[in-house]
Amino acid sequence: MKQLILFLLCLSTWTAQAKIYNVKDYGAKADGTTIDTPAINRAIEEAASQGGGTIYFPAGEYACYSIRLASHIHLYIEQGAQIVGAFPSATEGYDLAEPNEHTQFQDFGHSHWKNSLIWGIGLEDITISG
């Protein structure tokens, strides 16, 4: 009986972490024109609220601004899928750069992280594969 309970506990833990979140189910179009960032970030937020999971990118071109990672997230990019940095518009763009006391001594690209295509700070258990 103890072995059965232990097995079921392990199985439920594995199942919870193995959930797959298809970004198209959250509104991503993957047409190379539509900005898919909101859909991708919603999928990541949903997975994070459930303890983590796999964010699945089916084939297509995902035009994006800042994708915000969370702990225990696996980005799986299927063959034929691309995540492409989009050009900012007058009303949309990448996350604002965080304040940095050394800005006057370094160029912008080496001093800031939050305005990147894919970023996260203080996270653990992150993988990107495909």
Locate the predicted segments by residue.
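Bacterial Sec-dependent N-terminal signal peptides
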Residues: 1-20
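Extracellular/periplasmic carbohydrate-active domains that bind, remodel
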Residues: 17-130
